[in-house]
Amino acid sequence: MTSSRPSGRDSTGWQETVSNTSPKLVNAMEAARAGAAEVGRVGRRFLYRIWDWEPVNNRTINEPVWCLGCSYTLDIKQYGSPLSSSSLSQLTADTPPLDKSQLAATHQHQDFNGVRTTATATCLSDTSMSAAPTGSQLGSFDTVPDSVTSGYDSALAYEEPGQDGGWPPAFLDDFESRIWMTYRTDFALIPRSSDPQASSALSFAMRIKTTFSDLTGFSSDTGWGCMIRSGQSLLANAILIARLGREWRRGTDLDAEKDIIALFADDPRAPYSLHNFVKYGATACGKYPGEWFGPSATARCIQALADEKQSGLRVYSTGDLPDVYEDSFMAVANPDGRGFQPTLILVCTRLGIDKINQVYEEALISTLQLPQSIGIAGGRPSSSHYFVGVQGQRLFYLDPHHPRPALPYREDPRGYTAEELDTCHTRRLRQLHIGDMDPSMLIGFLIKDEDDWDTWKSSVKHVQGKSIISVSPYDPARGQGGGRAEAIDEVETLESDDDGEPALGA
């Protein structure tokens, strides 16, 4: 198996040399190395904050922008209610071909230049897409700029009328309707581990914090919980779509939205709380409270908690390799053969060593264009985001690195206030070029029925570039048939730290 872990000689040679002189010197050098890595991470974060300008859409090119399988463009020619089948042929040439089962809607809006435009939104139905749209269908990614970056920075982007950055209003409405989980503060204490090794598993910053303070536990996940929050976001949106449908938007069916938000309150009584992620991570994944999670540990927590809490959504995880086995999947989605249950597929993968290998870029982009898409939890090195949209080679994400007061647990979810719900949504776009993504990630897909399953299988197979997901009939672990012999050579291992997985943290 190809491994991203450096060889033992390369990684420990200096320690062996110095340890013959002084063990204390080894510890000091190890601390210095960890400190240097932390300084580099904080420096990158500082630069990202300074130049984290809102992206602006190039209205002249009007390239489609996608959000979890729905495509949006500005269209100055059309306005009105959802298009009839006879109107589908009038869609812009930039939008991939549609059939009569596709749903399109237009929205009139006054953009930031005062020009009245309409936005065309196209959501592909579960049965209308046998293969993911490719880069060639959407225009050349290499020759046309997809979006530009504005010269201002504001956390209140697009909140005022007309300040939409040139993006289709329907796209912003869709983006804002995605559930967004972030750092929280002042929640019920998560006790520190009494294991002597727990401290060494923490990041350098957390070690400093816990060493020089009388910290008996964690009442905030700032600095270590971003991968858990990204995983919560992915799970929350899967539950949202399974219950309310892909067309749900903010402001409709508030009670149903509150029921879902309550599942993720920052309290041990909430089924999918940070507390329960940490609890399961400690018992089953070897993750200490305050330690960064990686994609693999996050996927295992989601699967275990979903199985235990009976949310109406089933979860199938591929483990550390991106191979989906149909017999194992069906054992989760339809175990008794009496009825298919909505099932979330979680694919853990690593698409390179330090950055994503270019041969996988088209296939990765297509995962956000599939109608079954639930997004990607991953991001920059040691910094996880939740990716839900794409335009060209720019991916749009929800950033969990924004501390907010703890989301309270309520016995009656109808008691949540509008202000509390607002903390779980944002209209502020952030983008990252695919070449800047960390190669370790967790990809989610929601399969609603068997037709959806058949469509998804074909879609992940027929992609531009090299496929990042394989679907095989039988799981070798179940004693039937054999796995793909080439899978071991194709996939980079997820192991890159001492715990067997890359940790995406602060």
UniProtKB/Swiss-Prot annotation:
Pfam family, one: Peptidase_C54
Reaction equation(s) it catalyzes: [protein]-C-terminal L-amino acid-glycyl-phosphatidylethanolamide + H2O = [protein]-C-terminal L-amino acid-glycine + a 1,2-diacyl-sn-glycero-3-phosphoethanolamine
Annotated catalytic residues: 226 (nucleophile), 399, 401
Region of interest called Disordered, as start-end residue ranges on this chain: 1-21
Keywords: Autophagy, Cytoplasm, Hydrolase, Nucleus, Protease, Protein transport, Thiol protease, Transport
GO BP term (any one): piecemeal microautophagy of the nucleus
Name recorded for this polypeptide: Cysteine protease 1
